[in-house]
Amino acid sequence: MFSRLTFFFIAGTLLCCQLSKTENALTGPEIVSPGEVGLIADSLDLIRDHIQWAIDSQYIAGGVALVARDGKIAWYEAVGFSDRVKQDSLRKDDIFRIASMTKPITTTAIMQLFEQGKLDTSDPVSKYIPEFANSLVVDSFNEADSSYTTRPASRAVTIHDLLTHTSGLTYSYPGSKSGIIYSKFGVIEGWTKDSVLLADNVRIFARLPLMHDPGVQFTYGTSVDVLGRVVEVVSGQPLDAYIEEHILSPLEMVDTYFYLPAEKYDRLVDVWYTADANPEVYHDDYAVSGAKMYFAGGAGLNSTAMDYFKFANALMMGGIRDNTRILKEETVASMTSNHLDTLHLSDGEQFGYGFSVYTADGSFGRKMGRYSWGGFWQTIFWVDPSRNIVALLMTNARETPKWNELFDGYERIVNQSVKE
């Protein structure tokens, strides 16, 4: 369990072990030649070929890639189509559904409230959402008839558990135990066009049986949607209003929304579905149609490559952009350190607050300290503090059979472009 004192002790220790970023953050996104920031132009140009390979292979319709070093953009291009059927060319300022790349933004909102002393990561969630008191855990599950039994959880779910995806909440993966059980409750995961409030849906989350006791296992899922409701309760603002006032506006993220204004509808890219996908199950027009009243802290935002770069670069700079601070430097340091203790994701890769973090060097040229996250619609970003690199790749596609090859290959190209 992480108290405020423990949190800042860890953060302070981390800061002593790494170079401190200055507060002279980026004044507007400056675009430079790759060589000016120690990157090899010919190597970065392979990004274009890599994205084109994915387009030619029918995996995606197009992509916008952005690579920056030292806060300066060295490669920024759109390749392919925003609508492949209509053959509309993709533009750099087109808007993408970013799904789970919403999670780091909602986590940032939580940590702002933490800094203000309005909540603590060790607090039980029931302090803010009473329905989370006396949580139950699945004890047994009968695959034959989908019946299950429960028992009391070993302890209360905390804010820390939600931040680290160790709460026991998950997603209803098709055919899984969670998928079968969750279907009995009618819970909304991600986005919806229905007239539903976050507060009401989170009450259903609170009734769901946990898949395991809090804190004993990393189980990716809807924890950050619950955190979105905590933001609302603590701040007294709807989640969209809080994020706009305290994150998007200070960072001048002018094209990031839960629901797009009408004048920007034409900039939302079309989702490319491969032959194995069923578009009807995804309701991908949620950003421009429906009730527009559900603010999913774990999956609901839409953004551009440039906007998200502003957010990611502010993190790399220690929580600041243009002398506007959204987080303390020590808070960012702790958020991007491992918080899983003895739990383990994979060799070198662990989880902080809102990000996967590398505690050792990894494949594809990844360095210790790298942190990142991606989204359901095939988007990804990462920050490499050891090289001062921020990179993003935005696409919107589903059932892409080689999405790992797309993203990993992109990262390898970026890392190989660094002049040693």
Task: Tell where the protein language model's regions lie, with residue ranges.
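C-terminal motif of bacterial Sec signal peptides marking the signal peptidase cleavage site
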Residues: L15-C16
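Sec-dependent signal peptide recognition
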Residues: F2-F8
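Short, surface-exposed loop or secondary-structure junction motifs
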Residues: S135-M368
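Structured C-terminal helix/loop/strand segments within mature extracytoplasmic catalytic/sensor domains
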Residues: G374-E420
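Short, conserved catalytic-motif segment at the N-terminal edge
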Residues: G35-I98, K118-D120, V137-N142, D284-Y286, ...
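Active-site SXXK
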Residues: I51, G71, F96-I129, A133-N134, ...
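Short, gly/Ser/Thr-rich active-site loops of penicillin-recognizing serine hydrolases
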Residues: L19, M317, R321, T331, ...
